[in-house]
Amino acid sequence: MHVVTLRDPSSPLVAQFVPEAGMIGTSLRDDGVELLGQRRGLDAYVSEGKTMGIPILYPWANRLGDNTYTAQDVTVTLTPGENGVRADPNGLPIHGVLAAYPGWRVTDETDSGLTAEVDFGADPRLLASFPFPHVLTVAVRLADRTLTVRTTVTATGDRAVPMCFGFHPYLQLPDAPRADWVIETPPLRHLGLDDKGLPTGGSEPQPAREEALRDKAFDDAYDQVAEGAVFAVSGGGRRIEVHFEQGYPAAQIFAPPP
């Protein structure tokens, strides 16, 4: 597989993406220090959909409440194991249908930028799971010590395209023990979840917070994320920020047990 390496012109920051493995970001290194969690690696992502690095979860992030969904007056029945659908331990469709999808087409590549697209209307397997013809474009750029990911969805049919996707960056600070990491979150609304990880309808406001991670674990859902909101993790003299610049009103904070 062709790995595209991007270099920041103004710093030792280097990023790598693999378009033919789902346009996944596999590495973000600062002067050789890896800042993305590698987990089981690219091979497990390609063969089993086990996430690592920065995968795109599309056309839905997280899990659906059933194997049937309705959007834009269209009802779709999904079958885990078919047409890109993967199931969580409870049998619910999770993280969309593009895990390791090989059909991305690179439309632009420079030393510090990469753009690739998927035409949903051209692939019957994708349309079987998400029957809304459109072109999905992801553009990444590395500059000024910032990796920017911009996503564009352009409808190519008569139906509007439902939006429920996201990215799943796995961040790490190799210079500090996990227990010493400090996480910062903006003001949010915390959503109640049941034992399957599905929203219950309950919620409560959560003010901006800063706390040591220690031995805590999270898999929590939030909405009312303001445009420009900043999430951060710091430790060992290093700080990584994630900026929700535009178009992402919801978030999931995930920190598996140590």
How would you name each of these model-derived features?
Residues 1-83, 229-249:
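Beta-strand-rich N-terminal accessory domains
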Residues 6-8, 19, 28, 120-174:
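Acidic, contiguous internal or C-terminal segments within carbohydrate-active enzymes
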Residues 11, 22, 63, 98-101, ...:
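Residues that act as N-cap/strand-start positions at coil-to-secondary-structure junctions
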Residues 34-50, 78-103, 116, 180-204:
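Glycine-rich, pocket-lining loop/helix-strand segments that form or immediately flank
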Residues 70-74, 106-114, 141-146, 175-179, ...:
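A short, structured loop/turn motif at beta-sheet edges
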Residues 86-144:
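Extended, loop-rich substrate-binding clefts of extracytoplasmic carbohydrate-active enzymes
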Residues 160-162, 170-248:
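Active-site/ligand-binding surface loops and adjacent short beta/alpha elements
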Residues 248-258:
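A C-terminal functional module that forms or caps the active site or interfaces directly
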